[in-house]
């Protein structure tokens, strides 16, 4: 499954979280959602008891989010998400959707704000990790990516005489 393309932009990530959350009906998710949306929703439902257990260790997360103290959430949840493999990425997205559902159910804040906040926190983390790794977290390092190799071959074909011209010294 090539899912990294769905995480490339803020709008597509926001739509993905919205469609995988509980606020979207299963009919709407089936018709307008992607395979990744359904996989994330299924993972969220299957592991909801484990996610609830993880959140029970830090009961102040929702209170701090409601008060606008987002650094606690960043330190406890966001920094511990792992996007090193496709499975871990799906489980991280499912956990964020679970938190979004729980937070939306018990907050006075609008659903748009909660969705935007979760999307922005996740988006910033993905951008930061992409910048640090030099590649997308779910993609192999440089030299192992077949798409990049094809692009490099096309560039070489366009510039066939690059190595044949004699060097000129100035």
UniProtKB/Swiss-Prot annotation:
Bias-annotated ranges (Acidic residues): 148-158
Disordered, as annotated region: 137-170
One CC-aspect GO term: host cell plasma membrane
Entry keywords, A to Z: Apoptosis, Early protein, Host cell membrane, Host membrane, Host nucleus, Host-virus interaction, Inhibition of host apoptosis by viral BCL2-like protein, Membrane, Modulation of host cell apoptosis by virus
Domain of life where this protein originates: Viruses
Location relative to the cell: Host cell membrane; Host nucleus envelope; Host nucleus lamina
One Pfam match: Adeno_E1B_19K
GO BP, sorted A to Z: symbiont-mediated suppression of host apoptosis
Cystine pairings recorded for this chain: none
Family membership: Belongs to the adenoviridae E1B 19 kDa protein family.
Biological function: Putative adenovirus Bcl-2 homolog that inhibits apoptosis induced by TNF or FAS pathways, as well as p53-mediated apoptosis. Without E1B 19K function, virus production is compromised because of premature death of host cell. Interacts with Bax protein in cell lysates.
Protein name as catalogued: E1B protein, small T-antigen
Lineage of the organism: Viruses, Varidnaviria, Bamfordvirae, Preplasmiviricota, Tectiliviricetes
């Amino acid at each position: 499954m090539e899912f990294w393309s769905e995480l490339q932009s803020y709008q597509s990530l926001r739509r993905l979280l919205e469609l995988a959350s509980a606020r979207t009906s299963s009919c709407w998710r089936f018709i307008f959602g992607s395979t990744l949306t359904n996989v994330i929703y299924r993972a969220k439902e299957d592991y909801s008891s484990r996610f609830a257990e993880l959140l029970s260790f830090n009961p102040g997360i929702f209170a701090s989010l409601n008060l606008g103290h987002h650094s606690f959430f960043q330190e406890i949840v966001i920094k511990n998400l792992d996007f090193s493999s496709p499975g871990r990425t799906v489980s991280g997205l499912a956990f964020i959707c679970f938190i979004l559902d729980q937070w939306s159910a018990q907050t006075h804040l609008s659903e748009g704000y909660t969705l935007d906040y979760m999307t922005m926190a996740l988006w910033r983390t993905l951008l930061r990790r992409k910048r640090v790794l030099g590649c997308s977290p779910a993609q192999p390092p440089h030299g192992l990516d077949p798409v990049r190799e094809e692009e490099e071959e096309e560039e070489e074909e366009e510039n066939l005489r690059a190595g044949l011209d004699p060097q000129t010294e100035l």
